Amino acid sequence: MPIVTEKTYLMMEKENKLAFLVDRGATKGDIKSAVEALFGVKVVKVNVMNTAEGKKAYVKLSPEYRATDIASKLGLI
């Protein structure tokens, strides 16, 4: 599930990153594979953070893809 906050919106624009709330059992490799398969993009890096709400994944896309384009396809912006 995508996360949209002021912080994640700025990350989309400046750092070419998307944020997702993922299953607690998901690994970085699982997240990378899922994002690449679902959106047809190349993922450079995945950072995860465990929070009380669940596990957040910050996914950095390859420069040839734009995070804002993916977000607009999802109807987030």
What is the predicted function of each stretch?
Residues 1-77:
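Contiguous, often N-terminal, cationic amphipathic patches that form binding interfaces
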